[in-house]
Amino acid sequence: ISKGLELGSRSNSQVGNGTPLSRSTATSNFTHFRLNTNYTVSPFKDFIFMLNAGGQYTLNDLLNSEQTGITGEQRLSGFTSGAISGDEAWYVRGQVNKQYRLSKNFSVSPYVYTAGGTAYLNQPTAAERTATSAKSIGLGLEVTGNDEYFFDKSISAKVEFSKNWATGNIENTSSVRLNREHLLVTMAMRF
């Protein structure tokens, strides 16, 4: 639960000719409820099923900083992170991994996923949509390893290819070069 207070914040009446608020009908007095959850289970040896779901509910028109998105690495990863957001939203993502341990410190895990969600604006302007729905499917490969020689670090990498669909032209602006397809490459090193 998040509650906005009007202490020290600007309102639309105080903007004047200065910098406008991020949403013309939003105020700093708001309440929204957000829930994000995940569930992981291994139904068979070396298979992992992951389910991520969540959303946000509000009766208010929110400033951009309080809106929630349905895109991201554990959500609809086939779209640019932050490309689809709204005052209210829901998303769900299911993923199945098959893990191959190549050594004690190195594993490779191909996976397939599907995801969908919708973001809503409570009081859209003439240039905005009331709702933007999206879905994506894809496959990827995760590589994880541990290096015990220098600083005892964990190294992980991911390559994912996705096919996307969305209302309006969101998929066109998110994926200009790949024709509604998205390639995600990440690498992380944890000490």
Kindly give the residue locations of the regions a language model identified.
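C-terminal transmembrane beta-barrel domains of outer membrane proteins
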Residues: 19-191
